[in-house]
Amino acid sequence: MVKSLHYFILPLIGNALILNTPPEYQPGYGYVGPACAVFDSTLFLHGVSKRKLNDHELHIFSSYQHDLSAFKDSSSSFDSFEASFPTIPKFCGGYDDSIEVVLDSCIVRNNHVYVGDHLIRPLTNFEKQKIQLVKMRRMYGESKRKRSKRSSKPLPGTRPQRDFSEMLHKLLNINSTVTSRFLPVVSQSPLFAMEGPWQNLFELGKDKDMIELLAASQFKPQLPPVASVPVAPVIDITKIDSPYRATFTTMKPRKSQKPEKKKEVFNVFTTKTNPQITTTTMTTTTRTSTAIPTTTTTPRQISLQTIPFSTTTRQPNFDKTKTPATMPSASSSSLSSIQTVVDPIILKLISKALEKNEMIDEYSLKQALSMRNVATTTTPLPLRFILPTPAAPNPFLPSTRVGGLSHNHLFIPHQPFTTLVSTDSRYSAPNPLSHRLPNEICRVHMNSNPFHF
């Protein structure tokens, strides 16, 4: 009786283990692209890297790409019928560069099912539609990405150089045109293409806690009087001596505008007057008029390279009720003493973030400004950028787009189609069905296939 139970229980356990085990896919499972391709001087067959090619083989592959492009051009014209298909390189092993789909245990290429190098059968019409749908979804995702990139306006966080210039303009009050000219390498860093905490830094002026911290900071420039401001409406940035040192002035305000006594503490360069309300009472009527608020912009000088020690000391404020005549040469002396308006604490945070490839959150900025000491306030740090090291140019290295008779720009090595959406941000799935591959094409003849192993 016990032995008979073994005959019934053991097969059930074996079937349960077989059903619960995940399918073992071949290395190139989910690959959509040419059967033979060269990427970064590496030979790929069915999406799997095989070996590095030597210089002679790379030269042969480059010649093949050139001849293939010439064959396409000649075959599209009506007056040329003598063009022949170029010879496929020998290292491709007889595979052409036509697009294929690698499934769980077979490969679909040219509307036929292959297991290894053996031709099994042609596809049915229904299976052809499934394979064509996989290719169309892949092409649709790429074309949709390119079309949206051309037509749509750039969102915040998608243009690194512009966003970094705006961040410097908000935090350090630096002209955006200067940062765009002297910091073009920032666009090569993926750090500033992110959204989130960087965008929160643009709204520092709206936070009450941050206003108090910035108000307590001693790195507030002394504003010169408005009376004798030189007029320089146009800034020629080509005449700047140092690429990291910018000196410029803005337009001269009108003489009728008088600076207000009370100023907002979070904006050290712009004085914004409150609306003035004048009430005139007559015998029968009362008239109320509201003046438009005015904004007075004062000149500033900026230095990103060094921060002189003299700028960290506070100068006594002049009485604003005095006329400019009672203060001769006050404008020139204060303008020459104020050279930088950059807080070293902010520079230090940005420098550390660039070195560690991290982002600055609002909490760390508040904590750094609240815990300032003598060492941090007297030792400034300049901005430091991590430049990506470009690879050495290789004349034999082909581009990422592999030429061929089919859509070879879909080729991405080591990127299976099932995990492409989550691992590669360049492509986006048009719908959830993109993850499903027609693996039943291989399972139809899997048991009866003599070449399956």
Curated annotation (Swiss-Prot):
Region (Disordered): 140-161, 311-332
Database matches in InterPro entries: Pepsin-I3_sf, Protease_Inhibitor_I33
Domain of life, per lineage: Eukaryota
Segments crossing the lipid bilayer: none
Descriptive protein name: Uncharacterized protein C30G12.1
Species of origin: Caenorhabditis elegans
Lineage: Eukaryota, Metazoa, Ecdysozoa, Nematoda, Chromadorea
